[in-house]
């Protein structure tokens, strides 16, 4: 006679790992001739998580460079800006040392996080500094634009979208994401319009600053899995931002006037000291920035207090722009020389052309960001014709081509072209317009 289901003699299933019966655990999952309970699954997850954390801690211990090594690495990619580099190197070193220190149990002293604010004119290297730091430290890096952020519930991106982008960059490895660097650009564009508290709601200005406070200081952010929308009944990915280093940057156009008004008050009447407005440059004025200046500019005091390290970048002059064109590892001239080498031609950018490019960028007031468009414009016609001309061995760029008064010179490798060039007068050099 077959056994009745649920009778006392029915077969009781046991976990193949801990041997607990199905009545002692909440869930028993069946596989091919084996079973595993929910308690063993939790234990396996804990073991995997501990191993991942140990790997991440070992990576931080073994790869933490000294401030001098960080600055040396930054020097290879970013020209000038010595003081900001030193400040960044020390702040980043102390941040990751703090993470290591926090893992030591039983220590009474807790080290607070030192987030960084970069202030400098457009094209001075703020974004490049943050990107280079992340590349050196081999940590996840994400860049966000503050101008697209709004308060939660309004059309636009809320601040938690930044953490969502970070998780996507890390393939949803939460442990790795919690040691990342986040760079928020254009932070000055979310300043409030007045230094007095606003009565009406400012969802893209002061409201965003309020939303960023806890994220920057350290909180557990709930992010929808795989970038989905938020639903009440779904499980969220929990990301602790306590050990994430936040770097914010902005051009702060108009801050120099706030600083000048504070530092150059000289009274009235015959005893007043008369000073020229243009005595000091923007970079020099930025170096004297105080928290009160940033608050008057439009940042709320709470946000300024959570960004204790303020590094100011100098304006780039002509000499610095020439260095940027030629000296860094990924210098612009080196990039174009590699492009021309792929076509079998050598690119020679003369010193007077480098100076002409730098002067043009200074007139545009775009800093180093405008160098590529100027160089691209000067070489555009040549790059268009070069693939069709297989006998060009060298391209010479001079100042007149940059200024629009001529074309780059082409030197041909073909002997017949050289011979015809000699009849015309001067060797094998021909104008690109020919």
Curated annotation (Swiss-Prot):
Example of a GO cellular component annotation carried by this entry: HslUV protease complex
Name the record gives this protein: ATP-dependent Clp protease ATP-binding subunit ClpX
Domain ClpX-type ZB, residue spans: 3-56
Pfam families, sorted: AAA_2 (PF07724), ClpB_D2-small (PF10431), zf-C4_ClpX (PF06689)
Keywords linked to the UniProt accession: ATP-binding, Chaperone, Metal-binding, Nucleotide-binding, Zinc
Keyword Chaperone listed: yes
Chaperone among keywords: yes
Family membership noted in the UniProt record: Belongs to the ClpX chaperone family.
InterPro entries (alphabetical): AAA+_ATPase (IPR003593), ATP-dep_Clp_protease_ClpX (IPR050052), ATPase_AAA_core (IPR003959), Clp_ATPase_C (IPR019489), Clp_protease_ATP-bd_su_ClpX (IPR004487), ClpX_bact (IPR046425), P-loop_NTPase (IPR027417), Znf_CppX_C4 (IPR010603)
Species assigned in the record: Bordetella parapertussis (strain 12822 / ATCC BAA-587 / NCTC 13253)
Oligomer and partners: Component of the ClpX-ClpP complex. Forms a hexameric ring that, in the presence of ATP, binds to fourteen ClpP subunits assembled into a disk-like structure with a central cavity, resembling the structure of eukaryotic proteasomes.
